[in-house]
């Protein structure tokens, strides 16, 4: 395993990047295909650690699938309803929040004895609000170490009914319930307490659920109404669009040191909220050209921005790097949920930005960033967080280069990232 990657100063970027499949969509449709009636052909599936954890779990749960040699096409034979297991099993899910959270709800629909486990960071990522919601619907769930955190064991028992869910920690909790509750024995009404974070990710979930034949109504994201005793049905074939969060690094590179870069796989017809990043780039001064399935960014003078980025927390990290190349002070607001991601991203970003000379103020839920007078060559700690590694690769566009520690952490979502990044770069 590579301990570090030294990126030399890059003078210019230009070209086209074909994006890997979206992580958020890949793991959602793998699960939906598994519990739907019929066989689903998934194309442009993301090949990464997180999707592999989901595939491994589904196999242990009895799902039959055929994965192509390049791991981008998967034929999934749906079981037509909840998982029924006659014996106790344990599922290891690494640090894949997009796997453990939706699986917990689906596995709580039927009498089971299933342990959901993960790596050390997973044991620090909160899941208590989701567990509380499931218990309200009749589920029996036990914490195996610390209350509110994995590992956890579900015994089943979820029936539906009226559920109150905190919405201010992670949208994945609501996604988990939205996927499972159509299969519950009773109708379910989900009342959201507080402000719902990352609403575009809920839109992804609702869109995909509809593609699999189920429609869910809601009242301005405050109350969700789900009919029980439904069945998901295969759409036959589904092509996973490119990962919009991953697109942000290449679009940002063009804004800083283009040339122009075209990313394919996302565009005007994308269902992912993170395509909003391109609009933010345009507000900062870059030139953006949209097509149905591609976005092109061309360099222009960049100016600071002050914006609430709660709706695009992953792509907002890339804005923190753009701030270093922009005139003025950039403020990224309402991003408390950075603290419960793969690492505490607010703290990690502050520490690493200061290393390279930026002036940073870290608040409870915001970052204020002013560009450095001079960029300093630094070794960047990635905290085993794929997005830290990819974000800070852009420092190589500053003229001083950068050393990325533990670069292999990108395997969580984008194993070929550095290869693709260097392919559009000129030293």
From Swiss-Prot:
Active site: 314
Domain of life the protein comes from: Bacteria
Coiled coil regions, renumbered to chain: none
Pathway info: Metabolic intermediate biosynthesis; chorismate biosynthesis; chorismate from D-erythrose 4-phosphate and phosphoenolpyruvate: step 6/7
Main localization (coarse): cytoplasm
A GO term for molecular function: 3-phosphoshikimate 1-carboxyvinyltransferase activity
Entry GO CC: cytoplasm
Enzyme Commission code: 2.5.1.19
Catalytic activity of the protein: 3-phosphoshikimate + phosphoenolpyruvate = 5-O-(1-carboxyvinyl)-3-phosphoshikimate + phosphate
Record-linked InterPro entries: Enolpyruvate_Tfrase_dom (IPR001986), Enolpyruvate_Tfrase_sf (IPR036968), EPSP_synthase (IPR006264), EPSP_synthase_CS (IPR023193), RNA3'P_cycl/enolpyr_Trfase_a/b (IPR013792)
Subunit comment: Monomer.
Family of this protein: Belongs to the EPSP synthase family.
Protein name: 3-phosphoshikimate 1-carboxyvinyltransferase
Native species: Buchnera aphidicola subsp. Acyrthosiphon pisum (strain APS) (Acyrthosiphon pisum symbiotic bacterium)
Highest classification ranks of the organism: Bacteria, Pseudomonadati, Pseudomonadota, Gammaproteobacteria, Enterobacterales
Gene behind the chain: aroA
């Amino acid at each position: 395993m590579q301990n570090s990657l030294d990126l030399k100063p890059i003078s210019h970027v230009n070209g086209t990047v074909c994006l890997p499949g979206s992580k958020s969509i890949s793991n959602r449709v793998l699960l939906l295909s598994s519990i739907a009636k019929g066989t689903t052909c998934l194309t442009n599936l993301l090949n990464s650690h997180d999707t592999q954890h989901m595939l491994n779990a589904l196999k242990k749960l009895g799902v039959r699938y055929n994965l192509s040699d390049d791991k981008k096409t998967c034929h999934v034979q749906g079981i037509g309803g909840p998982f029924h297991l006659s014996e106790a099993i344990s599922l290891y899910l690494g640090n894949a929040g997009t796997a453990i959270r939706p699986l917990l709800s689906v596995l709580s629909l039927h009498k089971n004895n299933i342990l959901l486990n993960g790596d050390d960071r997973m044991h620090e990522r909160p899941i208590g609000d989701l567990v509380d919601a499931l218990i309200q619907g009749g589920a029996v769930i036990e914490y195996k170490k610390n209350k509110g955190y994995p590992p956890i064991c579900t015994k089943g028992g979820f029936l539906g009914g009226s559920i109150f869910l905190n919405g201010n920690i992670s949208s994945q909790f609501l996604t988990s319930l939205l996927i499972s509750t159509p299969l519950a024995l009773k109708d379910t009404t989900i009342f959201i307490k507080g402000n719902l974070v990352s609403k575009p990710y809920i839109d992804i979930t609702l869109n995909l659920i509809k593609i699999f034949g189920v429609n869910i109504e809601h009242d301005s994201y405050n109350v969700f109404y789900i009919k029980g005793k439904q069945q998901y049905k295969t759409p036959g074939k589904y092509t996973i669009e490119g990962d919009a969060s991953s697109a942000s690094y290449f679009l940002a590179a063009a804004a800083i040191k283009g040339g122009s870069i075209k990313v394919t796989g996302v565009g005007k017809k994308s269902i992912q909220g993170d395509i909003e990043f391109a609009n933010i780039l345009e507000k900062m001064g870059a030139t953006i050209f949209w097509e149905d399935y591609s976005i092109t960014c061309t360099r222009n003078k960049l100016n600071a921005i002050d914006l609430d980025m709660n709706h695009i927390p992953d792509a907002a990290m890339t804005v923190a790097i753009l701030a270093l190349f922009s005139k003025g002070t950039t403020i990224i607001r309402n991003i408390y949920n950075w603290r419960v991601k793969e690492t505490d991203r607010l703290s990690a970003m502050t520490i690493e930005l200061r290393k390279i000379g930026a002036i940073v103020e870290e608040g409870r839920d915001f970052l204020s960033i002013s560009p450095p007078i001079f960029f300093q060559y630094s070794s960047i700690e990635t905290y085993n967080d794929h997005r830290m590694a990819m974000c800070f690769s852009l420092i190589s566009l500053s003229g001083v280069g950068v050393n990325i520690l533990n670069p292999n952490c990108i395997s969580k979502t984008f194993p070929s990232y550095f290869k693709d990044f260097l392919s559009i770069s000129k030293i």
